[in-house]
Structure formats: C-alpha cells, structure tokens
Design a protein with these regions (language model features):
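Short alpha-helical segments used as structural interaction elements across diverse proteins
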Residues: 59, 63, 125-128, 221, ...
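Structured, solvent-exposed acidic/aromatic patches
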Residues: 34-37, 71-385, 400-407, 413
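Bacterial Sec-dependent N-terminal signal peptides
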Residues: 1-26
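Residue-level signal for alpha-helical context at structural boundaries
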Residues: 54, 61-62, 150, 188, ...
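C-terminal beta-barrel architecture of Gram-negative outer-membrane proteins
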Residues: 377-379, 388-395
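Long, intrinsically disordered, low-complexity segments
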Residues: 17, 204, 272-296, 300-304, ...
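Membrane-proximal, proline-rich intrinsically disordered regions
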Residues: 17-85, 89, 96, 104, ...
C-alpha cells in the first residue's frame, strides 16, 4: 500500500498543477517588492540588535566601557578588534542592514500614490530620523565615512566625507524632520512601528500619539548630537540643545524602546546570546561592581546576580576570570523581552543637567536634572523612589558634595545610567572624559577612541581609504574624532 501511495502522489500533484501552468513563466528568482514599512521595521531591528548584542563578533562596547568582563576569551576585552573583524561587522550592519533598507523604504513610500499625504510625510520624516541616528553611530565609531556617495550601487568606490561636515548635515536633516512631523496625521501602523507601536496588534492601522513620541525622540537625538559638538562648536551645540529642550523626552512614558518578544526569532539578542547560546562568558566588571558596592547602589542587584558563594564580585577586564567566582548579569538584563533603549528620560535629564552647567538656557537646575536622571535610572531597572532618595542622600552621590567638577559628577553617574547601552556609554566617556578607566590587562592598544576602518575598505577602496585615514590623523584606534578635543 505504501508503494502505491508513492506512485500515486506525483500523479495527484501533476493533476493539481495543470489547471494553470502560466505561472511557471514567472521570474521566481526575482525578489518580490517588500513594503516600505516592513523595510523600515527591519532596519530598526537591525540597529537595535547590533546595539544590544553581547556577541564579541558584533558588539564589544560592554568591555570597552568596563561594564562587563569576559571569563575566558579575552581578545576583544583587550582591544583586539581585528581578529574577529569587528569594524567590518559594525560597518556592514549600519550600511547594508540598516541604512540600505531605510533608503529603499523611503523610495517605496515616496512613490506610493495611494498613501495619504500626511501619513506619507510623517513616515518619510520618521525614516529620516532613523537614518540620521544610524549615520551618527557611524561617524562616532569611525570619523570620516562615506556619506554623499554611500548606498549608491553604481559607485563601488565611495569617497569619504569629512565627519564634521557630515555631522552638520545630519543636524540640519534632524531639524527639518522635526518641522515635518505632524501630529494631525498618523505615522506607521502598529505592526511596523516596533518602538512606539504595539508589535502584537497587527490588525491596528495606527496608534494614537506615536507621532508625538517620535517628535520627542527626534528632539532628544537633536539634544544628544548637539551636545557632542559642545567642545568644537559651542554655538551650534547651544542652539541645538535650546531648540530641542522643550520638545524632548519629558518622562519615562516617552522612552523610545525597541520591544522584543518572547518567541524566536524576535527575542532579545542578549537572551539569544546567553540563554539560547548557553554562553558562560559574560561577567560583571570589577570597575563597575566596585563602585556599585562602595556606594550601596540599589542597581547592584538589578544589574548583576551573585557568584556561586552568594557574593557580589567583579571580574578583571582583560584577565581570565573563573566563572563561578564572579557575578553574572542579572536575569532581567537578558530576559527574552528585555528592550533596547534608543533614547530615554535618563539620558535626556543628564543632557539637561550638562546644558545648565554649560550656561545654556533650559528650565530647572543642574542638580534637579541630575537627580531626575538617577531616579529614573533606578526606577527603570526596578528600584523604588525610596531607593533613589536614599542613594541621592549619600554625600558621594549628592550633586553638591559628590567628587569633582560637573563633568566628573555627571560623567560618572551617566556611565552607570547607560548600563546596557554601552555604545552610548563609549561616546560619553570619550566626550566627558569621565570616568577615567584604566586599561584592561594586556591591552593591545591605548583606549580606543574609534574603530579602524574595515579591512575590505582598505583592500577594495584603497585610494579613498588612504585619503580618509590621512585626513583624520591616521587609521588608529587611538586617533581622536573631531569632537573629542580633551
């Protein structure tokens, strides 16, 4: 009987397929058009995945800023970024996996004559905000990068644009986007907006208030990028920050969070790395852990678990650490649904505190914003308002008595507040110069102020690579970016 079934099955299938054989003339290998909103959400996910990831093949920043250490493999913790091709992976993720999709999404949506003009304007502005965000990551990672010639398939050898010029254009684009976002119209539907929409409710056509939240997100990005310029163009920084302040994130309810789900392949990259991948590599860094312990920081138990003896112990960055002897990240940090924070109230309040210290016109006092930022961080991770009040009452935490001038006070607390946002932590350490971290054991270089350019660029785009390397002062990790003057 089984043999007869095997013989009969092809006959049945052939009969079923003979009703319409014209479809076999279709170009089955030609990709079908992907909707613009889907490309947008895919690009945003690729950015988020890269920024949250803990894989040493993708994201090394937790070790660079000494939030985490490694148990066994020390290459990346020791600033060896070339063995695994980290610069290439970072470059590819931003250009190919994010910016290329965002550009195509913009093209498709622009050409859609059926789309309501107001919705189209909002969608294009939101896409551009994310393009600015991604290009900002590239500039802050490498310095001069392809910009005007980037993403042009007809030009395989793009020139590199001056980083400061790129930054100025990004700031202009961001200001234009803020002017175009119109709260009278919807933006992306809920199934495509994984930051402010509900990713599960795919039947919805829109979510009230999402455009307002994108306005706040874009304004915080404007503040953040503006402040990066403070040491090299204080006038431009002041204008950007003061313009954005009233529009920027004003509470935790405005936080821009990429929402991961509990099922594969949509769960958090940290969950994928640590739980699914069963990695026993990642441990607390002694540098951060010692500070959390010394200051009785309520985030200690929210950031990390104990070692096998029930104690909180950090591992030495760059040195082999016995996994059972040191603390590991707390389970909430790598939960399947742990979100990635694109921008939040914590960061925005630290920016406002800094703005007051720089003499910019923003409401409130530096101390108020500093306190708000720390409180928001403790609450975000699951602490209480009472925990925050007790912590802020400590002389080594209180703004008026904490060690150092404002850069040190804000820089130190921002380093803690940007836990699980290590790329942004790397930017802030370079910008504010605090905390002043010691080099890891057996460091392969000085502190990395940038990534070197990818090997592919050196080999395939050699002339433009050589010009770019000379323009920034040499393709070395120690070379400072244009905004890093101190």
């Amino acid at each position: 009987m089984r043999k007869l079934l095997y013989i009969a099955l092809p006959v049945v299938l052939l009969a079923a397929c003979t009703k319409d054989i014209s479809r076999f003339n279709d170009e089955t290998k030609k990709p079908q058009t992907v909707p613009g909103p889907m490309l947008f959400s895919n690009a945003v996910k690729n950015i988020s995945d890269g920024l949250q990831n803990a894989s040493v093949n993708i994201n090394v920043f937790r070790f660079t800023v000494k939030h985490w250490a490694m148990a066994v493999y020390q290459d990346e913790a020791q600033f060896d970024f070339t063995t695994r091709g980290i610069p290439q992976a970072w470059w590819t993720r931003m250009y190919r996996d994010a910016l290329s999709d965002l550009q195509e999404a913009s093209r498709i949506i622009s050409a859609d004559a059926t789309l309501d003009p107001g919705i189209k304007q909002n969608q294009l502005a939101i896409i551009d905000v994310m393009q600015v965000y991604a290009y900002g990551i590239l500039v802050n990672s490498f310095g001069n990068v392809p910009y005007k010639d980037a993403l042009n398939s007809d030009n395989l050898f793009p020139t590199y644009d001056d980083a400061k010029t790129v930054y100025a254009d990004l700031m202009k684009r961001l200001a234009d986007d803020l002017g175009k976002l119109n709260t009278a119209s919807l933006g992306f539907g809920a199934s495509d907006d994984i930051i402010f929409g509900d990713p599960i409710a795919s039947t919805k056509t829109g979510v009230d208030g999402t455009v307002i939240k994108y306005l706040k997100f874009a304004a915080t990005v404007q503040m953040k990028m503006g402040m990066v310029l403070a040491a090299v163009d204080n006038a431009a920084a002041k204008t950007a920050v003061e313009t954005a302040d009233a529009k920027a994130i004003a509470s935790a309810a405005d936080n821009a969070l990429f929402k991961y789900l509990s099922n594969s392949p949509s769960y958090s990259p940290l969950y994928s790395d640590i739980v699914v991948g069963k990695r026993s590599d990642y441990v607390a860094a002694k540098d951060l852990m010692d500070q959390l312990i010394a200051m009785s920081d309520p985030r200690k138990t929210l950031f990390f678990g104990t070692n096998n003896n029930g104690d909180y112990v950090g591992g030495i960055v760059g040195k082999v650490n016995t996994f059972s002897d040191v603390s590991k990240p707390a389970s909430n940090v790598y939960a399947a649904t742990a979100p990635y924070v694109f921008a939040d109230y914590v960061e925005t309040e630290f920016l406002r505190a800094e703005a007051k210290e720089r003499g910019y016109t923003v409401a409130g006092t530096a101390e108020q914003h500093y306190n708000n930022a720390i409180t928001a961080s403790i609450l975000f991770w699951g602490g209480s308002a009472a925990d925050a009040a007790t912590y802020l009452a400590r002389p080594d935490v209180a703004y008026t008595t904490a060690t150092g001038a404002w850069k040190q006070k804000i820089g130190f607390q921002k380093w803690i507040g940007l836990y699980s946002r290590p790329f942004d932590g790397w930017v802030e350490i370079r910008r504010l110069d605090y905390p002043q971290l010691s080099l890891p054991v057996n460091a392969k270089s000085g502190f990395p102020n940038r990534f070197t350019y990818p090997l592919n660029e050196q080999q395939l785009n050699g002339t433009n690579y050589t010009t770019a390397a000379a323009a920034i002062g040499g393709d070395k990790v120690e070379t400072k970016l244009f905004w890093d003057k101190f």
